[in-house]
């Protein structure tokens, strides 16, 4: 585990974006942990998040020409990632986002920011079913651009309806790589280093039942 990945977990725990307990998911599964990027609610937390997303993107070695944030949670994430790329990696990238409702006045349309062109890195919090990100892929395709990668905070490494995770299904279907700052293996590693045997046992059992590699 890289230092920034451990820092991300610690920030998520401090902000209560990552919690341990019993949480009923939309799928009906009772999960021993829950992740909600909406809990990162301060300027400092967002600045740190931007650095983590930027580092994950740079480490992956993906070539890209711009940043895109899907509405709504992806918008601040894309903004802070673009800022971090400029400040820490000397990559001054254009960025854009979409709104969920079409605006009839002013500039109109659903897209805001830089024109969608070239290779587009999409920044989002998580991929659950992949519906929202598929809509964004359609927008990028319609603009004549190409998706370079999708970057998320956490990959739950968890089966969907079949044997594959939502992320694996999306990668197979679209050919677009999905990069994550951390995955469930990193969470397990962190719990082990902290000596948190109770949560480690619960998350390990959940992973054995629903996990994918």
From Swiss-Prot:
Q: What's the superkingdom here? A: Bacteria
Pathway given for this chain reads: Pyrimidine metabolism; UMP biosynthesis via de novo pathway; UMP from orotate: step 1/2
| One Pfam family of this chain | Pribosyltran
List positions binding 5-phospho-alpha-D-ribose 1-diphosphate. 26, 72-73, 99-100, 103, 105, 124-132
Leading EC class: transferase
Keyword Glycosyltransferase part of the UniProt annotation: yes
GO CC annotation terms, alphabetical: cytoplasm
Q: Which reaction does it catalyse?
A: orotidine 5'-phosphate + diphosphate = orotate + 5-phospho-alpha-D-ribose 1-diphosphate
Transferase recorded as keyword: yes
Q: Which family does it belong to?
A: Belongs to the purine/pyrimidine phosphoribosyltransferase family. PyrE subfamily.
Q: What is this protein called?
A: Orotate phosphoribosyltransferase
Q: Which gene encodes it?
A: pyrE
